[in-house]
Amino acid sequence: MTRQKILITGASSGLGAGMARVFAAKGRDLALCARRTDRLDELKSELGQRYPNVTVAVSALDVNDHEQVPKVFAELSDALGGVDRVVVNAGIGKGAPLGSGKLLANKTTIETNLVAALVQIETALEMFKTSGSGHLVLISSVLGARGVPGVKAAYAASKAGVRSLGESLRAEYRSGPIKVSVIEPGYIESEMTAKSNSTMLMVDNATGVKALVDAIEREPGRAAVPWWPWAPLVQVMRVLPPRLTKWFA
């Protein structure tokens, strides 16, 4: 099934903007939202020039402003005449070692990556129930497969939470009419990973985003991307002794 009208959160940069470019090249209409409206406007202009037959609607949205999420989703849906896929992508990579006295960074990460994701999920489900169908895509991470020490502890926990919500929804809607996919990116070049000390198995943005979109289009229940090496590595991560998980942090 071709999902023609796609809403992406956190679309002003990184994986969100990359997905928007790839979907636009496929001729899909886009509803894009993020905090940085200047970047969104630039992206809309870029896509409009390259793909004049594609409709691109943009709106400012801070996903931590929970009351705004349903309002912005509704406005963007109206602009496109409906939405049949929502990609819950907005997130941050802040963090500090647990017990380091830097609670705010970890709290903000959990709130943005998990609590705000829950708000987006609830909003998308209401939209899909009204329309009768839809594809909900949750962007988790390979780090959601296993807790890790250091600065990524809260990030990994938040993405594990997203993964768990997705698994619950897949069971809830196992017979439809809503499809749910949990996508677990490995290390893909972006503004977020540029701030990371780990470059292990990093792939360039274009390669990573293509793998991401290809996986979304297949509408799997769950997928690590790029498949190689991350799909087998995720299985390894789940059984590693705790002392060895530092290599993924």
Where are these regions (language model features)?
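C-terminal helical subdomain
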Residues: V182, N197-V234
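Conserved glycine-rich Rossmann-like NAD(P)H-binding loop of the short-chain dehydrogenase/reductase
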Residues: K26-L43
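Substrate-binding pocket helix/loop in short-chain dehydrogenase/reductase
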Residues: P97-I110
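The beta1-alpha1 cofactor-binding region of Rossmann-like NAD(H)/NADP(H)-dependent oxidoreductases
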Residues: T37, A60-K71, L103
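Active-site helix of classical SDR
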Residues: I121, S158
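Conserved glycine-rich cofactor-binding loop
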Residues: S12-G14
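Residue(s) in the substrate-gating loop at a strand-loop-helix junction
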Residues: S141
